[in-house]
Amino acid sequence: MIKVKICGITSPEDALTAVEAGADALGFVFYKESPRHIFPEEAARIINLLPPFVQAVGLFVNEAPEIVNQVSRNCRLGLVQLHGDETPDYCRKIEQRVMKAFRVRSLTCLDPIADYRMSGCLLDAYSPSFYGGTGKSFNWEIAREAMTRGHRIVLAGGLTPDNVAEAIRQVRPYAVDVSSGVESAPGRKDADKVREFIRNAKEAL
């Protein structure tokens, strides 16, 4: 069954709503420029409330590797999501399992993926100004091509309760990732949208 990650969690209430709705993973944004930024101490308190089989994912953008490793240990993250311009050499310095994000404009954006050793590959829409969380989608044919190349794809970018089922049917990804598509405001989740998104994703195939 498709896995679902709800990203940009900033409160215990939103975390528990997502868990109760069936989320497989929750994302915590440690990038200070993001409207969904959370301090590690706050994230750790929320993560301590999670049941054992819900994975905590920490999102970082061009952060020093030693900081990533320290936050990962302190928060007991299950996965580190690198959403910036991190190189394969950088990724090898991360102690925890890595999911690298690639911002997609064309098929050529898939070429560097083979150079990385990672647990998963997140495909997001390209923006010249933002590292994810834009609410924009991209051509899902590119994501489907990535699947045919044998990559474990986590599909992100412009997903909503209304389009997630079709996205899953077209791409057949390992997982889907949503942030702005289930929000009432940046960093504030809409409980009804969260429930609808997860339900539609889980029932898509």
From Swiss-Prot:
It catalyses: N-(5-phospho-beta-D-ribosyl)anthranilate = 1-(2-carboxyphenylamino)-1-deoxy-D-ribulose 5-phosphate. Its EC number is 5.3.1.24. It is an enzyme of class 5 (isomerase). It comes from the Bacteria. Keywords: Amino-acid biosynthesis, Aromatic amino acid biosynthesis, Isomerase, Tryptophan biosynthesis. One of its GO terms (biological process) is L-tryptophan biosynthetic process. The keyword NADP does not apply. GO terms for molecular function: phosphoribosylanthranilate isomerase activity. Pathway: Amino-acid biosynthesis; L-tryptophan biosynthesis; L-tryptophan from chorismate: step 3/5. Belongs to the TrpF family. This is N-(5'-phosphoribosyl)anthranilate isomerase. It comes from Trichlorobacter lovleyi (strain ATCC BAA-1151 / DSM 17278 / SZ) (Geobacter lovleyi). The gene is trpF.
